[in-house]
Amino acid sequence: MADSSNSSLNCTAIHDQTVLILGQVFNSVWLFISVIFLYIFACKLCFRPRIYLWLSFYTLGFMLWVLCKVLQEYVTGKFKCVITNCIGDFCLVFLSCIMLGIMLDRYLKIQGTLRGGMKDIHIGIFVSASCFGSLMIALLDGLHMGDSEKLQFNGTESFKCLPATSVSSYKAQLMFKSIFCIICIIMCLILTCLTAKKVLGTRLRKKYVIVGNVGLLSFVNILLWVMIACGLLKQALESNLSLCPTKQSTYIYPYTMPVTVIFVLVIYLFSSTHMKNAMRKSGQIRHSLSSPNQVQSSFRLV
């Protein structure tokens, strides 16, 4: 059965119309909240400081992911499953790259390599490269999913698309995504430690507050990657791995994961303001850094 068509899968029906309707209501709420965030970042804050430009791209990627889940429920067509599955893969890689970009920008500001951190053009290049790389990875995954028609699930479940046409392909997908998340965790830890070391090497009176904020932001992102990696690894290592939809993949993951993304956005809004105030209240800043460029970079830490 492992490599058979979905038509021969003997899956337990898990469709729940009430849960499905509630899920779509929540998806509408997430999209509405995302629009509010975009309005705040663009119209109220004018993308300044530049952290809000980063978060705008992050919000757009999140909105695409939510729309992908909605489309998977209601759109029909031969290539629907391939397209929506690829969009999901694209969003995972793209959103992770944006978070790593934020951490890299933060480190460059402290390091003083780029005066004031990345400029708008640098951010645009990074986002464009991330978008292109994410698209290539999604397309490669799409080529290994199998026959597009066999990805259509012929049942009453809410889960309208299979992840692949064979268990071996599905396991490879799970392993790749797990390894990708682990790599993101490692890179996040490296950038966080380098940033914290640089801040602690100064004589800022509020340096421990700043490091605490940096650590909090990194912890939230690492926690999200750990949750994804552990869930995917658990599935990949199952001896009886099946293509059949589960309650976790159908309801729990799609409808609860947006909560963590909204939480990340709120944390960044709060911590950015808190960190900026801590920098401004540090009276010894001009004596703690070695150059005017680093002074300016520190005030623009967020």
Curated annotation (Swiss-Prot):
Transmembrane spans: 21-41, 51-71, 82-102, 123-143, 174-194, 209-229, 250-270
An annotated GO cellular component: host cell plasma membrane
* Residues exposed to the Cytoplasmic side: 42-50, 103-122, 195-208, 271-302
Q: Which ranges make up the Extracellular topological domains here? A: 1-20, 72-81, 144-173, 230-249
* Top-level division of the source organism's lineage: Viruses
- Protein's cellular compartments: Host cell membrane; Host endoplasmic reticulum membrane
Alphabetized GO MF terms? G protein-coupled receptor activity
Q: Sorted alphabetically, which Gene3D superfamilies does this protein's record hold? A: Rhodopsin 7-helix transmembrane proteins (1.20.1070.10)
UniProt entry keywords in alphabetical sequence: G-protein coupled receptor, Host cell membrane, Host endoplasmic reticulum, Host membrane, Membrane, Receptor, Transducer, Transmembrane, Transmembrane helix
Where primarily located?
Answer: host cell
Q: Which cysteines are joined by disulfide bonds?
A: none
Physiological role:
Acts as a viral G-protein coupled receptor that constitutively activates host alphai-type G-proteins, thereby inhibiting host forskolin-triggered CREB activation.
Family membership: Belongs to the G-protein coupled receptor 1 family.
The molecule here is called G-protein coupled receptor A5
In which organism is this protein found?
Alcelaphine herpesvirus 1 (strain C500) (AlHV-1)
Originating gene: A5
